């Protein structure tokens, strides 16, 4: 169900982990989504994104300055209701 507020526990960008935050905008107009990455020790990395109408926006957290090799959680606020999820991948050596 679309909502204006989303809280995603656990994200990690160290080692062989890749974390993605996915935002789906089901609305007829574009919307701004403010994303706060909550860091260990109380720090916050704030970034805003414009998400087009009827589209999904993918954020590769590993590529954001200040999120290299760290754990975090994520708080998102949309101007309009959106749908969010967090995906994590781990590359295990064979």
Residue ranges and their predicted role:
Residues 1-94:
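Gly/Pro-rich, tryptophan- and cysteine-flecked surface segments typical
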